[in-house]
Amino acid sequence: MARLRRWHCYRKLEVPYTRVSRSKNKNYIPGAKPTMVRLFHMGELTRNPSEWQYEASLVAKENHQIRDNAIEAIRVMVNKYLESTLGKKRYLFIIRKYPHHIYREKPVVGGYAGADRISQGMRLSFGRPKGRAVQIYEGEKLLSIFFDDITKAKDIKYFLQVARSKLPWRYREEIVEVKSGKPLAL
């Protein structure tokens, strides 16, 4: 069974590798997979973010990369929690980062006799495109939840803590008033 390589190989930032085009002659990266994140805006889509009273966000504490299937897992989980506690029309959930970066993997042959005849070592060791990742920098918001009901702020903070536990590296939760920008003390 094919497995994903452990993410500690990729989570440090590198030069973005992103040139994908619909026309074949302009496409520098052949065989790049599409992103696994299907929706970036969920909930009440008719209201602008500035029309809500409160914003809860996950803010990165360090520069790093996140695989797109980790973001998709967080999206599904947080959206399910928000729908069950707040209802479909009482929040706006936005994923603020798009997985542009395409990470590569050089398959390592080993474990059987004659592997040295098959692999070329480090000659032309660029690797093949395996998936997409988000490159996020310190202080940037990965996702935001907009809401009006202050009594649900502790629930939303808990949802962000659960989402944070599924991500690599470190984040902090921020809940602020949209109009004034003042942080809420919970």
Swiss-Prot record:
One of its GO terms (cellular component) is ribosome. Pfam families: Ribosomal_L16. It comes from the Archaea. GO terms for biological process: translation. Transmembrane segments: none annotated. GO terms for molecular function: structural constituent of ribosome. Keywords: Ribonucleoprotein, Ribosomal protein. PROSITE patterns: RIBOSOMAL_L10E (PS01257). Belongs to the universal ribosomal protein uL16 family. This is Large ribosomal subunit protein uL16. It comes from Nanoarchaeum equitans (strain Kin4-M). The gene is rpl10e.
